[in-house]
């Protein structure tokens, strides 16, 4: 297990606070791990998942023999990597005779395994298998639409669980406002049967329509695959209750240098910058300066009169 150290500096304390559970969570980073043995298909799937999540994923290419997500004691390495990388969702790939092309998707809470779902990969098509106009290719880091088609996602418990995990995997950071011009991709999940889901990645093609809202078409850009549900493990009640805890009101931001007084009410401190008096322009309105200006004015008047008299005499 990773050694727990108390922070000795303010920076270390802020880093630990940023990694702690929050009422309003930030975007979830994804950890991609390889098992003892992986097939060529599974390696391609994990590589393309990393490309789709680029900027929000960390991938370890080394094989891990000690990770057994569904076995007791096999979660220790997962929790260690989660704490080390600050990732709250993971993708673990393995290939055996009993479970070929096996992918385990899981979520973490406070660096503990929250829930797990295991799927098998079938009918995988890589990005290179699709031909399309490259100008419609989705840009890196854009927000996706996530579409779930089929009643099974509402009725079947395993499909509902898979829907929650896939949403957390692909949605990225939750934001209040979106720029519609930046929406250029969609993940389409179709429930074929109670245990099988077709997943494909599409680009959004905008076309002219008779109104302000453009008409949208989906262009399949890949990858695409069938996900066959094998095993799943839901979170225990105590962990779920702790993870689902919410606040009725949003936490208020602390106001700096502000106090409440029983008599004066709300009081505050204002820190003014140092005043450089030598560089300040001061208006001199003293009596002495006025007298000097008056004398100069009279002198100028006498000089102009003398010049006029000289010109007239000539």
Swiss-Prot record:
This is Ribosome production factor 2 homolog. The keyword Nucleus applies. Belongs to the RPF2 family. Residues 28-238 form the Brix domain. The lineage of its organism: Eukaryota, Viridiplantae, Streptophyta, Embryophyta, Tracheophyta. One of its GO terms (molecular function) is rRNA binding. The keyword Nucleus applies. It is found in: Nucleus, Nucleolus. Residues 238-314 are annotated as: Disordered. Residues 239-249, 275-314 have a biased composition (Basic and acidic residues). Keywords: Nucleus. GO terms for cellular component: nucleolus. GO terms for biological process: maturation of LSU-rRNA; ribosomal large subunit assembly; RNA biosynthetic process. Pfam families: Brix. Its main location: nucleus. It comes from Arabidopsis thaliana (Mouse-ear cress). It comes from the Eukaryota.
């Amino acid at each position: 297990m990773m050694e727990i150290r108390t922070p000795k500096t303010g920076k270390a304390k802020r880093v630990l606070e940023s990694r702690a559970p929050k009422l309003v969570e930030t975007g979830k980073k994804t950890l991609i791990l390889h098992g003892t043995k992986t097939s060529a298909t599974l390696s391609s799937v994990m590589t393309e998942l990393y490309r789709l999540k680029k900027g929000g994923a960390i991938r370890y290419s080394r094989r891990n023999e000690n990770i057994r997500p569904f076995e007791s004691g096999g979660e220790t390495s997962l929790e260690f990597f989660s704490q080390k990388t600050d990732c709250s969702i993971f993708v673990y790939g393995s290939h055996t005779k009993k479970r070929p092309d096996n992918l385990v998707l899981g979520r973490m809470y406070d660096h503990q395994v929250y829930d797990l779902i295991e799927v098998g990969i079938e009918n995988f098509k890589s990005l290179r298998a699709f031909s399309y106009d490259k100008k419609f290719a989705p840009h890196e880091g854009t927000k996706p639409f996530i579409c779930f088609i089929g009643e099974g996602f509402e009725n079947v418990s395993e499909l509902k669980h898979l829907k929650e995990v896939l949403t957390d995997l692909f949605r990225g950071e939750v934001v209040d406002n979106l720029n519609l011009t930046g929406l250029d991709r969609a993940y389409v999940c179709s429930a074929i049967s109670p245990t099988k889901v077709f997943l494909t990645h599409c680009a959004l093609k905008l076309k002219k329509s008779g109104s302000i809202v453009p008409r949208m078409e989906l262009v399949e850009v890949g990858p695409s695959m069938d996900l066959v549900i094998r095993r799943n493990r839901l979170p225990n009640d105590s962990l779920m209750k702790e993870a689902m805890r919410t606040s009725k009101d949003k936490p208020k931001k602390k106001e700096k240098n502000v106090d409440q007084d029983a008599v004066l009410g709300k009081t505050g401190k204002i820190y003014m910058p140092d005043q450089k008096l030598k560089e300040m322009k001061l208006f001199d309105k003293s009596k002495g300066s006025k007298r000097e200006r008056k004398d100069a004015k009279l002198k100028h008047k006498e000089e102009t009169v003398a010049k006029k008299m000289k010109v007239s005499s000539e």
